[in-house]
Regions:
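Residue-level marker of regulatory loop/turn positions in helix-turn-helix DNA-binding domains and
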Residues: 19, 30, 162
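PAPS-dependent sulfation machinery
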Residues: 56-159
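Post-Walker A helix-loop "phosphate-sensing" segment adjacent to the P-loop in P-loop NTPases
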Residues: 44-54
Length: 247
């Protein structure tokens, strides 16, 4: 539904296609390595804009600067997120969610149908493996289309965005955003994946009554080991001045 609305709006507002996304900042790294707290910290800088949960969830019409902090959709999305906590009790204590908090890029990419978001919520290992093998050129082009839409009535000097999943697709990200800067966060992998596996168990409890923590932990370790390897391979082809490490 969101995708159809965005495509329709883009066709009726040609100025959307003329929006320029300049020098965006992307935060990535294994999950539970401090990406979220760093994201929310940098988003406080007035020279950056981050896509808020409410505008990613309900992007039609594009947000306006004058009503950005009072838009009626904020309240509606907050109610929706409260329902998510009822479905997966305890999730909010593990990972902060809120209509006005910065949202991850997996939710933007989900409307292009290739996204880690689905694998976090459901036990779909074949899909996740398939997604890692896909050419993401069109997906990151869609990512740009989404940002163009969000800023058409509320310009952004620079965007700051975040998703651990970008680690698997750095070559596609940089091909779409050649002037992007990338922050790669670090933590002991065992600690990071153990913490993330706990998050996945909690999140999936809202969609399944067959949660196997051991199987989830084993799969997440294998999955993100592959993602980290993909990220290191892609990074070797990037300028050292484009990627910054934080630990």
């Amino acid at each position: 539904c969101v995708r159809l609305q965005l495509v329709d709006f883009r066709g009726r507002r040609p100025q959307v296609t003329r929006q320029s996304i300049e020098r965006p900042l992307f935060i990535t790294g294994l999950p539970r390595t401090g990406t979220t707290i760093l994201y929310e910290l940098i988003a406080q800088d007035p020279s950056f804009r981050s896509p808020a949960s409410w505008e990613v969830t309900r992007p039609i019409p594009p947000p306006k600067e004058a009503s950005y902090n009072s838009d009626k959709r904020i309240r509606s999305v907050d109610r929706q997120l409260a329902l998510a906590e009822k479905l997966s009790p305890g999730f909010r204590a593990i990972h902060a969610i809120g209509a006005e908090l910065p949202q991850e890029c997996v939710y933007i990419l989900a409307s292009h149908f290739i996204s880690e978001q689905f694998g976090y919520m459901y036990n779909i290992p074949k899909y996740r493996s398939w997604a890692l093998s896909q050419d993401m050129t069109a997906s990151y082009r869609w990512h740009t289309n989404f940002l163009q839409h969000l800023q058409v009535d509320f310009g952004a000097e620079h965007w700051v965005m975040k998703a651990p999943a970008h680690l698997a697709y750095l070559k596609y990200l940089v091909a779409q955003y050649p002037d992007a800067a990338i922050i790669w966060t670090h933590r002991k992998p065992l600690d990071a994946i153990t913490s993330f596996s706990s998050l996945v168990c909690t999140l999936r409890s809202g969609f399944s009554n067959a949660i196997n923590p051991l199987a989830i932990g084993q799969h997440e370790m294998q999955h993100f080991s592959k993602i980290a390897s993909m990220g290191m391979l892609d990074r070797s082809a990037l300028s050292a001045r484009q990627v910054f490490d934080v630990s």
